[in-house]
């Protein structure tokens, strides 16, 4: 799944103002899957979403798609150290269920994102978050891209020495 150099430039032109923000850069501090940081995971999801839209001719709004993908896990905490399962009541407070809400609140607060971008972020964990169903093509694309990236990162991008994979190389082996 590789974007052309021109497509990468187009994608980066959309997300550049978000990418340089200090709070987005904070996502580099947190591990997402295996040894991949949350920042790298979100970048991977943006690249895969853009690729799916272009290659499958899905005609999605590329700005909303790219912004929603980049910010879909903008929750800004280490989910590995928060909470444990203590029965059914606490189930919906666990990270998998709750982080889309935190990410959406943070994105609205920091960037004043659109309703469509909010929908993308809020529904990206469907079907786990069964009440937040993707309602636009951009949300479906990001939801699928997120699942794909999570599998690739968890199975194939694990560090054997505990090093963190981040920043310079994405899921297809190239920079932005």
List the predicted regions and their residue ranges.
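Metal-dependent phosphohydrolase cores
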Residues: 1-176
């Amino acid at each position: 799944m590789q974007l052309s150099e021109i497509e990468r430039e187009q994608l980066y032109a959309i997300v550049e103002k978000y990418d340089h923000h200090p709070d987005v850069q904070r996502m580099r501090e947190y591990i997402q899957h295996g040894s991949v940081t949350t920042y790298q995971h979100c970048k991977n999801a943006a690249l895969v979403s853009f690729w799916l839209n272009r290659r499958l001719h899905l005609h999605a709004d590329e700005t909303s798609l790219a912004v929603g993908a980049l910010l879909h896990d903008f929750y800004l905490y280490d989910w590995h150290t928060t909470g444990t399962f203590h029965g059914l009541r606490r189930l919906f407070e666990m990270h998998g269920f709750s982080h889309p809400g935190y990410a959406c609140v943070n994105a609205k607060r920091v960037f004043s994102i659109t309703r469509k971008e909010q929908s993308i972020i809020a529904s990206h964990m469907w079907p786990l978050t069964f009440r937040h169903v993707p309602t636009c093509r951009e949300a479906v694309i990001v939801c699928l891209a997120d699942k794909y990236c999570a599998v690739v990162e968890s199975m194939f991008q694990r560090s054997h020495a505990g090093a963190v994979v981040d920043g310079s190389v994405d899921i297809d082996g190239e920079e932005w």
